[in-house]
Amino acid sequence: MKITKLEKKKRLYLMELDNGDKCYITEDTIVRFMLSRDKVISEEELKEIQDFAQFSYGKNLALYHLSFKARTEKEVREYLKKYDIDKNIVSQVIANLKEDKWINDGQYAYAIINANQLSGDKGPYVLTQKLAQKGISKSTIEEILNDFDFSEVAQRVANKLLKKYEGKLPARALQDKIIQNLTNKGFSYSDAKIAFDDLDSQVDQETTQELIFKELDKQYTKYARKYEGYELKQRLTQVLARKGYDFSDIASALREYL
């Protein structure tokens, strides 16, 4: 077979043969096989050219994808699938990129976790979930997590939450709110409790009284339309307890309020 045309088409070249066959190849393929118009090639050589062209095209696509930011192996595989590249060729591209250090799931996970240590607010459970979604193995994630202490991150998040809710909630509700937020962010209950216990979060009696009377004003308006006497008192006690107020504080406030 003889090459009758080599024509540049954007990123690729169109190669035509005298038997009517056509295929798109990369510039790297032309250089590697020293292709030119009128060059004679065999069936075996054509297969090699086509395979390498697919590999070269896939690698170029992957490198373009990686040029914006680091990616995991799973992310690169999914990107290449969009271009209908043969699965075997994709595996060859991935192996080549891993060998050249373009893809390293361990380094990717370490970078994400380390960045979280410096300025993030996620605990190990949420980080594990996010990294697993990107295709990183559980064993790799666990191995890297073992190198990090999340107590400082938990304390940093707890301090921010304290600033947000202090003076707005009674003591028990404040504790519940901060611990719940920490567990939602991926910290274990024990780590969240330790972080809360290390806070200077004393809610004084004056603040508690101010909060409970403010809440009473709102709830009394709501329940006094339907209830009175003992039942009204019970309804108000229940709703205030659900909001985190101690029963002794509730009883004291109701004696003054009603």
Curated annotation (Swiss-Prot):
Coiled-coil residue windows: none
Matching InterPro entries: RecX_HTH_1st (IPR053926), RecX_HTH_2nd (IPR053924), RecX_HTH_3rd (IPR053925), Regulatory_RecX (IPR003783), WH-like_DNA-bd_sf (IPR036388)
A GO CC term attached to the entry: cytoplasm
Record's keyword terms, sorted: Cytoplasm
Compartment(s) where it occurs, according to its Swiss-Prot or TrEMBL record: Cytoplasm
Pfam families: RecX_HTH1 (PF21982), RecX_HTH2 (PF02631), RecX_HTH3 (PF21981)
GO BP: regulation of DNA repair
Protein family (similarity comment): Belongs to the RecX family.
Function of the protein: Modulates RecA activity.
Protein's name according to its UniProt entry: Regulatory protein RecX
